[in-house]
A protein has these predicted regions:
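Extended, subdomain-level signal for the structured scaffold at the beginning of enzyme domains
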Residues: 20-22, 27-142, 146, 155-166, ...
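Compositionally biased, intrinsically disordered low-complexity segments enriched in Pro/Arg/Gln/His
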Residues: 13-15
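Catalytic nucleophile serine of serine hydrolases
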Residues: 150
Length: 222
């Protein structure tokens, strides 16, 4: 079966063997206290990655995606339109990825967790899509664990799910998130119950570590 994330032609970042796509070596992290227990296994956990069809910051999609795959989970790419997603590296076009499921057809009960990558254009476009906002709201109502990074929290404000929450983000979102009822903190990664948030691509090692732990803990408790 073809994996849902595309092959890449950048040998220094991805490797393609006889079996097709093979994930990069594990992400190096900056913490000596990384959890390596069985609770971090995501076997059987289906994780929705929700992005716009254009504008997602590539690393904020691919690195959590790889972390979920390495832990045994099943990442699934959702977008408003079928076809492909155009990733960016800041302002430059990067790789494309095939959409697995249109968010129009997606329901929270079909997934065990949600990841919202960043990218300014991605987040701005996504918050204007009614089905994307509906899906995010459903995930919170169903108490699904959620990971969000950089500009990703914009859609959380649109979905009206931030009242009483504490999270971090790209600094320019601070006022928007506080106006939506959240407490904003400037931290590499912040965990508020089953909501994991980080500020920027430099925070990805910590973000991926906590995301896998929180997703696995939630799956183990069901």
């Amino acid at each position: 079966m073809r994996p849902s994330f595309p092959r890449r032609n950048r040998a220094k970042r991805f490797h393609v063997g006889n079996g097709g796509y093979r994930a990069r070596p594990p992400i190096e992290t900056r913490s000596a206290s990384i959890r390596r227990t069985a609770v971090d296994e995501l076997s059987g956990v289906r994780v929705a990655f929700l992005v716009a069809n254009e504008g997602v910051e590539q690393r904020e999609l691919t690195e959590p995606w790889d972390a979920v795959r390495r832990a045994g989970g099943e990442p699934v790419l959702l977008a408003p339109e079928p076809g492909t997603v155009q990733c960016f590296e800041h302002l430059d076009r990067a790789d494309t990825a095939p959409v697995d499921v249109s968010v129009h057809d997606a329901r929270a009960e079909e997934f065990d967790a949600l990841v919202l990558p960043g990218g300014v254009a991605n987040a701005d476009e996504l918050r204007l899509d009614d089905d994307a906002v509906r899906f995010v709201r459903e995930c919170f109502e169903a108490r699904r664990p959620v990971g969000v990074i950089c500009h990703g929290p914009w859609i959380l404000a649109e979905a009206d799910v931030l009242d009483g929450r504490t999270l971090t983000s790209w600094p320019s979102l601070e006022t928007d998130l506080e106006n939506a009822g959240a407490t904003w903190v400037d931290e590499e990664v912040h965990v508020d119950g089953e909501l994991v948030s980080s500020r920027k691509p430099d925070d990805l090692p910590a973000f991926c570590r906590e995301l896998v732990h929180v997703f696995a803990s939630a799956a183990a408790s069901t």
